[in-house]
């Protein structure tokens, strides 16, 4: 019985150590989440201004030709590409599984042969997942920071837009988890290219009428539209990283809570075993005393 008690004590000690680790990881993830939420909030200000500028540039009779820019017009789709944003590590609950499962279902429905399907992977989990299934990413980025700067992702974003402009694929989507709150995220598949969600009717009429352009509208849009596409993709990356940090915090909180429950159950088991051992010893002492009478 003494060995059994020692085993239980060792399990309790081991589980307490695990609980301390997961609790520390939860606190780290919570700090990362706060920074990510602040970064996402600040970026939205920039993204909205870029969007407004593009919308204003596309407003009015003078912008008629500009609205036929190659980044705004759909072309016959021979190949589709998907930017897939996952984490570089585990311990994030179902964060990665949600995205990868949904994308494989989408592939089975719309790209059964796989010949018209390309993936661009941000995150090791996604890249390894597709390689294991014989799908080679056309581009990938691993080891992204928890609060990635634009410089960190500039190359993969610019390369992706360049591939679209060179017609290596005809439409581009981004697949990621949208951060709702610390407990909830939503899997999204959003079209990035061609740009389809701009409404020139949202433009500021007064601003547009007073707009003086030093260069042609077309040449300005040649610079501005890629920047707008970059901002949309970068915004999705920041959003996904925020959701990842939230998922990590929730997963570690769940692990900590589970460890506490295990410790509670083991403590009850230990107390019962100890009580049984004491009862057994008392019984043996009484039996021995009776034998001596």
From Swiss-Prot:
Protein name as annotated: ATP synthase gamma chain
BP terms from Gene Ontology: proton motive force-driven plasma membrane ATP synthesis
Entry's family note: Belongs to the ATPase gamma chain family.
Signal peptide: none
Assembly behavior: F-type ATPases have 2 components, CF(1) - the catalytic core - and CF(0) - the membrane proton channel. CF(1) has five subunits: alpha(3), beta(3), gamma(1), delta(1), epsilon(1). CF(0) has three main subunits: a, b and c.
GO MF terms, alphabetically ordered: ATP binding; proton-transporting ATP synthase activity, rotational mechanism
Cellular localisation: Cell membrane
Main location: membrane
Membrane topology: Peripheral membrane protein
Keyword line: ATP synthesis, Cell membrane, CF(1), Hydrogen ion transport, Ion transport, Membrane, Transport
Organism annotation: Streptococcus sanguinis (strain SK36)
Transmembrane recorded as keyword: no
One of the record's GO cellular component terms: plasma membrane
Entry keyword Membrane: yes
Function of the protein: Produces ATP from ADP in the presence of a proton gradient across the membrane. The gamma chain is believed to be important in regulating ATPase activity and the flow of protons through the CF(0) complex.
Superkingdom of source: Bacteria
């Amino acid at each position: 019985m003494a060995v059994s008690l020692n085993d239980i004590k060792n399990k309790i000690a081991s589980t307490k150590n695990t609980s301390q680790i997961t609790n520390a990881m939860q606190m780290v993830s919570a700090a990362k989440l706060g920074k990510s939420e602040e970064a996402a909030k600040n970026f939205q200000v920039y993204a909205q201004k870029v969007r407004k500028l593009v919308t204003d540039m596309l407003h009015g009779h003078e912008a008629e030709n500009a609205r036929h820019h190659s980044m705004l017009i759909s072309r016959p789709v021979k190949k589709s590409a998907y930017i897939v944003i996952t984490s570089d590590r585990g311990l994030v609950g179902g964060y990665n599984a949600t995205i990868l499962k949904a994308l494989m279902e989408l592939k089975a429905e719309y790209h059964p042969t796989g010949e018209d399907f390309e993936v661009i992977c941000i995150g090791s989990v996604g890249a390894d997942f597709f390689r294991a299934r014989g799908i080679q990413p056309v581009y990938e980025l691993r080891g992204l920071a928890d609060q990635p700067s634009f410089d960190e992702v500039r190359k993969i974003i610019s390369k992706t837009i360049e591939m679209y402009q060179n017609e290596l694929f005809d439409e581009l989507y981004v697949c990621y988890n949208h951060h709702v709150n610390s407990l909830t995220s939503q899997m999204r598949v959003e079209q990035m290219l061609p740009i389809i969600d701009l409404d020139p009717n949202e433009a500021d009429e007064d601003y547009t009428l007073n707009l003086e352009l030093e260069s042609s509208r077309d040449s300005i849009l040649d610079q501005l539209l890629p920047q707008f596409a970059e901002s949309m993709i970068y915004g999705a990356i920041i959003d996904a990283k925020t959701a990842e940090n939230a998922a990590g915090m929730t997963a570690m909180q769940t692990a900590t809570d589970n460890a506490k429950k295990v410790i509670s159950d083991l403590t009850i088991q230990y107390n019962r075993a100890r009580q049984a051992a004491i009862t057994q010893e008392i019984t043996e002492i009484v039996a021995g005393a009776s034998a001596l009478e």
